[in-house]
Amino acid sequence: MSLRPFTGTSRTITQDSTSESNIKKGKNSTKRELIEEVDVNQEVENFDWKKLSGIKPNKLYEKNWQEKVKLKQQSIVSAYKEEAISVTHNAYTTTLFPQEVIKNVKNQGKLYYHIGMMAIGVKGLHRRKIGTKVMIMFYDDSFGKAREASIGSIEMDMNAGCGVFYSCPDFAKYIKDLSHLKIGIQTLGYENYEGKNLSVAIKTIGRLTTNIQSKYKINVKDIVEQISSQGIIMVAPMEIDSSHLDGNEWDLSKFLNHENTSRVPTKALIYQNLQGGESLRFSNYKQTRMHDPTENNSDEDEDLKILGEQLNIKMARFYTMQTPEEELREVIQQLEREKQAMIAKLEAKMKESSKMAIVEDNFNPNNEYLEDTYSEYEDLEFEKLGLTGWEDLDQDSIETEEITEWENPNQVLHREIRAYKSVSEQIEDIFGELLKEHGNYDMALKNLEEKYDLDKIEKAKSIEEIAKSSTSSEIRPTKRPKEEQTAYEDDMRDDWKRKELTVNPIEASKDRNFERIGSSYKKNFYPSRSEILNLDNVPPQFYYDQLVTWEGIVKNEWEARKKDGMDMWSWMDGRITGLVLYLVQDWISKNQAAYNDIKSRGDRPENFVKMVKDRFLIEDPTDERRTALQRLAQRELEALNCEDPTKIQPFMAEYLKKASEAKKGFDVVYVERLFDRLPEAVGKVVKADFVKDGNSYEAGIGIAVSYISTWMRAKCIKETEAKTQKKASLAFCRSIYTIGDYKKRKILKRVTNYNKNRRKNYVRRPSIKKKCRCYICQDENHLANRCPRRYTNQARASLIDGLDEDIVSIASDDEDIENFLEIIELDEFIAHSSQEHEHTWEIGGKKDKVCEICSYFTDYNKTVSCKTCETQYCKTCSDQLALEVTEVKKPTKEETMIDDLKLNVKNLEFRVTILEHKVEMQNLQDKFETMQIRNKSEITEIPTTSLAMRANESNYIKTSINKTAGCYVETKISFNNENRIITALIDSGSTHNIICPTLIPASWINNTHREIIMFAVDNSKYNLNQELIDDIKLQFQEVDETFGIKYKLGQTYVAPKPTKTFIIGHRFLTNENGSVTIHKDYITIQKTTGIYPTARHELKSEFARKHGGRPPLFSNIPETYNKIPHLHSYQPQPILGYKNEIGNQSLITMVKELEALGFIGDDITKNRTTWVCDFKIINPDINITCATIPYTPADKEVFEKQIKELLDNKLIKKADPTCRHRTAAFIVRNHSEEVAQKPRIVYNYKRLNDNMHTDPFNIPHKISMINLIQKANIFSKFDLKAGFHHMKLKDDFKDWTTFTCSEGLYTWNVCPFGIANAPCAFQRFMQESFGDLKFALLYIDDILIASNNEKEHIEHLKIFFNRVKEVGCVLSKKKSKMFLKEVEYLGVEIKEGKISLQPHIVDKIKKFDKNKLNTLKGLQAYLGLLNYARGYIKDLSKLVGPLYKKTGKNGQRIFNKEDWNIIFKIEREVSKIKPLERPKETDYIIIETDASEEGWGAVLVCKPDKYSGKDTEKIAGYASGNFGEKKTWTSLDYEIEAINEALNKFQIYLDKDFTIRTDCEAIVKGIKTEDYKKRSKTRWIKLRDNLLKDGYKPTFEHIKGNKNFLPNFLSREGDFILKCLQNPDSTESYSIDSSESIPLYIDSKESHSIESDDSIPLYRDKLLPLVERLKEKSA
């Protein structure tokens, strides 16, 4: 608790007929009363220090929770001390208790001291008003920091001369620690003062006890009142939140037995500090047992064992024979001799190792060398480590002092050698210590660079140099450069100068990938099979092999692991490391635009791999904290040189590694320097060829290394073929592995013309979904390119020879011909592909094909292809080539219909031909039968049936229906919650859908735009001029007798005559590029797949049920059948409110993609969010239970349906049998749900909510959010589908959500509705997901996208939709609306910058059932509905005041005539609500206030700037209210409270300087002269806090009461006259809101300001008749 001034009502003691002398003497005969006014100066003069001593200790603990008998056993201690002190420059500290009190308390035999109250008085020993200040702090120095130590603090102005403060800490302290409680005092302004300047008195009251209680309840109230009545200001303690410690790690090892142990160092480092002196730093601390000299039973022999056997023996002799000095001197001499012998051995080892050549410095690439200077270090002598002064120890000190562990010096030195740390590790150790010291990374790094010189830290300790030389035979000792050399090259260490990079053949031969061939080494390279790409140890000539291998692995891994919402680029970025990562980072940092262009082509892993291949290991290291390591790597990079041609490969690998570490991978200077560092015979030639081939140094070192490796390979090949050049000049060929015979390269090509006879030659690529066998030996453990038995099947081995890709053979049952491939030679393919013709470029291409130029994959709309030769380019490359792309004109609806009709005509003509042929064949058959059967006189006519309409029927078109043979299905067609169940005929021969007019309502039928002529099978003609309206939905009855997915029926014509049939024709069957397959027992619908039974199946099912069998579909459903959610075609305006005029194809495509992924729709299971709710339980031991609720049959039916849906969507699950909780679920049917015909389940989580910690996350303020969009002109509104269900639940919280219903006990997997903390948790989820989008307003699950113009809105929607895809949430399709000029949001309607109440709220208020007002719930519902209109009706709170009184306990429910007049008046006011406006951000704000006994009123006025004239002022809002009970306030109190209320109402507009106008002159003068600071009344203090809390500077301005026109009316009963003044002809009464601030806009011509007093009579003349007329009406 922070010590702050008491903010309650101050009280002062006044005397009645009593002198001050009597009060000072403590007489009780005076009459004392509490009044409100306080005279501070008088109180200071009457202040008496003894008032502190007058506080009774027993009164403080009078009402303790313990019994009085036990209370007597407690010791209550009161301490008082007073002293004069001098505090000028330094701080003064004193203990809270006098020393004699602390001593007496300790002798009481108690353990704890509870501090009940502390009071301190400070009085200046000088004259008043000298401009000084005093700060007092009550603290506990048991803590190390002031923030935790502070119990309370206060500063006071000594102008008054004195001050008294008190605090009730209410905590206990251990008796021995009472001296830690202190009072600290500092002063300002006493710098030139001499002598005692302050007198301090301290009073404490506490209680001694032997046991600590769980809670002390002390009687503070009476004491506080006593102190407050004497003018003492309260001091409150400080509260510190422990949230910064949440989630910290607890070290359990601290529980181990570390008794009598201490941390002692084992290493010391002496170095030169910044001041030129020497400093000592210890490190390598270890836990060591220490001897406690107070223990009498300690075993001295056990302590002596720590010194080792040798020392133990000598110490034993020391106690018996020698003096301490002699014995210690002998020990030191022995140690010195052993040390010198060890150093001699190690120096010999150094000389031997210095002859060896260096392969490379074993530096840590992740650390840095700094350029600051370091002092010269010599070997540390034992004497310099403080091992002197043994002779100063006496016998007693040796016996009682703890002796640390001693070891043989040889063992110590050997352990140091084994524990040797490299230079980089030393830097890390020092940097870690600096980081702990400063607590800031940048500050620690700065101190590291300032203090230490990395060139010299290697020689800091000679023991480390010895260890380094002994562990690496190839490293030579370093030498310090000469001080006088200043050139960069000369200033380097010897091992950093340019030198020849050599390889130790003995060490190299240990690598399993090398084998010795003659005098050279041949590399048998096997690429790593890891999905993480690391080329640090890969020779450059095998980079391609490794990259190709990695490409196949990482692509398969991505396809296997990818999920919706995963970012491919982030995932692939985690699959590279080492120098690859460094170079990739470096390239991106310098080519950000190119990188973004690659990302824009689509999320394909091939693009990322291609980027790594082309740019050769690129990325961006922007971490500036690695500058020291970069400098070290840069110096090593410049030191590299190669003179031996056979060592070019390892030299380039090292050069590339150092360049990537130094971030010089794309530095032109270092790329060119790579060629210069090569052997002269090679470097000049390859450099010239590199430039000649058109390469640039800007391509990077990776490209240069690859070019050099390729160039050397070509030279070696040429040398091998020609065999004429001397091998001396091409000595590097010994390190290059070449292929003896060059073979033609082969590639895979998709099979376009399948030939059954060549099936054995077809292959396919490996698939992660199927088992793959080797193409050669059929082994599942490897593929053909790595087959160890490659030549067992030489025919197949020769077929794949030269093929770089992995392949597998075609299985015998594999019929996926589209994925069959054939192997062809590359030359043949190029010759075939390079046929010359005139290309015709169009938008679009194959998705699995790359660009012919850049080899990147692109999306369909970003691809250009030639339809003749199928050559395909990306949009970027086509723009660079300036190709002329033919825009394919999208056919109109009429053209599409004409084309369809033409196609149908051709089909019908073909069918007619077939039918004629069948008729002819039938006639021939009849003639044949007639000739054979002559004995029959009559020929039986073959009955024929027709399924088409006949023209010769007048009333009805007869059809012969055989349901056992035709494809008839049960369907449901619906529109606007009205549906019909009809038996339909699936007829693929019918061109259109045709329905009988008697089967559907007449309201579903529209006239066609033109008459359609239809021909039947018998060529009869029919004219169709009616069709069904759009948006008719069609559902099929499924096997389980439920109707499935809704399909769009499409264009359906109404038959001209009744047929009693519904024919589903070709138009529906081929709708949405799908198809319908008709089987005997069922039909299958492709794309939107479903299986629906026909009438034949129903007969079979009925037969099967009678004989105990199963329906055929339940036992005969194809294995491949799976219900796929229907993909609705995107129709912009009806579905999402999208304007056809926008025409932004990319936005439409994006919406279609989101619909396809399910992110726009009504299926909550499509969400891919990973957000997990973290609800905190207060008491985990509580069981949540409930009583059983009876359910009606209707409730059970609802439960059965909705619970099944929740289970199918996996939102809930069956509860665990061991679950301890259950919450009741019940059905709610209110008006809105009855209209929608969907009752909902409600869960009573009240007990669970009571047992949960409240989530502190704030829900946004509605008014503040509305103000953010006042400039927007175009909106899009979205709503998340079942918003809370997007959040997952932690496993340990799921059981708490278990609920019971008629169907059983179930547990939620996602966050259910009804959890109290769910809105806050969901708002946090929305802020984390979309909070950075400044144009998106988020209010729980409502999202509003607001933009200034249409173009900006399109870009905002694209960004928003991409974020939706990343987050994986589902937007409700029904509630999504885009490109709106006006929108309803948060209860208001926004249009053209104006805000009005939503129309449906107005309708609800006007149409509210008046019969419900006589009931308490009905009246409460009506008043709650009126809260939405508070911001739009003046004085509404005053108007509805009588109605609120009816809701009380004693309120009368029955409405009388006046009550009904209030209701009717409210309805009239609601009908007059007009749109409102808000002040602009640049406007200057003025608040005008006035007050009366009836209430207060305020007006918000705005103008363009502070200095604009009054004619520019406009009223932007107003507020009013009452003061509740009538209080005995003065007029000044009312005016002050009116300003406070106005500041609170208009707080959101007060973010800058403003002006307050009031007709109270006392307030204006008091503020300007700061006289208000001397007042202690609560309202003045509250006014001061309101004025200063936000840091703005208000200006007070006084106006005369007759000019304070509108605020004056707002604060009185006659405030309704304002509206009468605006509308003199009106006879209605008006009122102004009493609780809410209401934005309002009035034109400048109607400004309320009155310039002169002369105009007042004019207004009075208008007002008086109106008042009289209104009074008569009300009477």
From Swiss-Prot:
GO (cellular component) term, any one? host cell
Q: What is this protein called?
A: Polyprotein P3
Active-site residue numbers: 987
Q: What does this protein do?
A: Capsid protein self assembles to form a bacilliform capsid about 130 nm in length. The capsid encapsulates the genomic dsDNA. Following virus entry into host cell, provides nuclear import of the viral genome. Virus particles do not enter the nucleus, but are targeted to the nuclear membrane through the interaction with host importins.
Q: Where is motif Bipartite nuclear localization signal 1 found?
A: 479-499
Which is a Pfam family this sequence falls into? Caulimovir_coat_dom
Q: Where is the composition biased (Basic and acidic residues)?
A: 476-485
Annotated source species: Rice tungro bacilliform virus (isolate Philippines)
Task: Name the catalysed reactions.
Answer: Endonucleolytic cleavage to 5'-phosphomonoester; DNA(n) + a 2'-deoxyribonucleoside 5'-triphosphate = DNA(n+1) + diphosphate
Q: What EC numbers are recorded for this enzyme? A: 3.4.23.-, 2.7.7.49, 3.1.26.4
| Keywords linked to the UniProt accession | Aspartyl protease, Capsid protein, Endonuclease, Host nucleus, Host-virus interaction, Hydrolase, Metal-binding, Nuclease, Nucleotidyltransferase, Protease, RNA-directed DNA polymerase, Transferase, Transport, Viral movement protein, Viral penetration into host nucleus, Virion, Virus entry into host cell, Zinc, Zinc-finger
Prodomain residues: 792-964, 1086-1138, 1620-1675
Chain intervals for the UniProt region annotation (Disordered): 1-29, 468-491
Q: Describe the location of the Peptidase A3B domain by residue ranges.
A: 970-1077
The UniProt GO MF terms for this protein read: aspartic-type endopeptidase activity; nucleic acid binding; RNA-directed DNA polymerase activity; RNA-DNA hybrid ribonuclease activity; zinc ion binding
PTM per Swiss-Prot/TrEMBL: Polyprotein P3 is proteolytically cleaved into several chains by viral protease.
Keyword presence, Secreted: no
Q: Which InterPro entries match?
A: Aspartic_peptidase_AS, DNA/RNA_pol_sf, Peptidase_A3B, Rev_trsase/Diguanyl_cyclase, RNaseH_sf, RT_dom, RT_RNaseH, Viral_movement
Q: One biological process GO term for this chain?
A: transport of virus in host, cell to cell
Q: How does it assemble?
A: Interacts (via nuclear localization signal) with host importin alpha-1a.
Intervals of motif Bipartite nuclear localization signal 2: 744-760
**Chain ranges of the Reverse transcriptase domain:** 1208-1390
- UniProt lists compositionally biased (Polar residues) regions at 7-21
Zinc finger residue ranges, unnamed? 772-789
